[in-house]
């Protein structure tokens, strides 16, 4: 079943690699803030290379050091795995080209089986 099914869990932003503290309680972190530099997705089946990890951050989880992927690249990759050419989903509005993967999204071939 996993051969024909694409399973995805993730989001377009991660969380800061350190806890956030509020001013009233400096001893215990109360969570983590949104973090747009790095994010994690779990993907399985449907043409994804099994058992692989794509991309790396530095030892602090702050900067991407290898395999930078934009959310538009993820959208292009998901559409590709569903058999849809993301570049054909383009429409023009007020003189600009629009599509789900924006005009600079690319399929991340390193994720494909």
Regions found by a protein language model. Name each.
Residues 1-113:
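Ligand-binding pockets and gating/stacking loops
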